[in-house]
Design a protein with these regions (language model features):
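Long, charge-rich, low-complexity intrinsically disordered regions
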Residues: 2-14, 54-195
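N-terminal cysteine/histidine-rich coordination modules
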Residues: 3-4, 15-16, 31, 44
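N-terminal leader/presequence regions that precede the main folded/catalytic core
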Residues: 12, 21, 33-35
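Positively charged, polyanion-binding regions of nucleic-acid-associated proteins
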Residues: 15-29
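Polyanion-binding surface elements
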Residues: 26-46
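Short, flexible coil/linker elements and helix-boundary hinge sites characteristic
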Residues: 32, 40, 53-54, 96
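Charge-enriched amphipathic alpha-helical scaffolds
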Residues: 41-59
Length: 195
């Protein structure tokens, strides 16, 4: 009898990997769409712009090579046109962020993985909320009602902005996603965060 055939006992690592991979792909397919579907007749042009560093990369690429993007992947680029980079960098700089670093993050496709909607406002807000929550957690004062209120408000707002993340994102990126570290962990640590 093998470990996979004994109910309630160890499951073979390959079976676990297969389940995780299946759940990962299910998540991606339910939250993202093929780039070809979003780009339509402009697919070659869009792929060229991605390769040239003018448009964000797909959020995910499936094992079969399908490039997956958020349904609104081209909304911001279409709105800004040729001024996309200048517009975003100006907005990032005005918000006190490193415009080159934020532009690189945008082009990597990472913001589409993290955010429900990718706009200059949501990218900037996420960056500021991450900084705020990290600062609050570094100086944890759970008995202080002002600190508790500030943490809860920031965590709740970040929760509204962020997607759930795919099951394998932690392995994909080599780090725990912000949802785990800055939303789920504080809620697990302090019961009052969940009520």
């Amino acid at each position: 009898m093998t470990a996979t055939s004994v109910p309630g006992h160890l499951v073979a690592p390959r079976a676990i990997a297969d389940r995780l991979a299946s759940a990962d792909e299910d998540y991606i397919r339910s939250h993202f769409v093929p780039l070809a579907e979003v780009a339509g007749h402009r697919l070659a042009e869009v792929r060229g712009a991605i390769a040239a560093g003018h448009l964000p990369a797909p959020a995910y690429v499936l094992d079969d090579g399908t490039e997956m993007v958020a349904p609104d992947h081209l909304a911001l680029p279409d709105e800004a046109g040729d001024a996309l980079e200048a517009t975003l960098k100006a907005r990032f700089a005005a918000a006190g962020l490193d415009s080159d670093e934020e532009w690189r993050s945008y082009l990597s496709g990472a913001y589409a993985i993290c955010l429900r909607t990718v706009t200059p406002e949501t990218m900037i807000r996420k960056t500021h909320l991450v900084e705020d929550i990290q600062g609050l957690l570094a100086d944890a004062r759970p008995r202080d009602p002002d600190w508790r209120g500030a943490l809860r408000a920031a965590v709740d707002e970040l929760d509204e902005l962020e997607r759930p993340f795919a099951p394998l994102d932690e392995h994909r990126f080599g780090a725990r996603p912000t949802r785990k570290r800055l939303i789920e962990d504080p809620r697990e640590r302090w019961p009052w965060m969940r009520s």
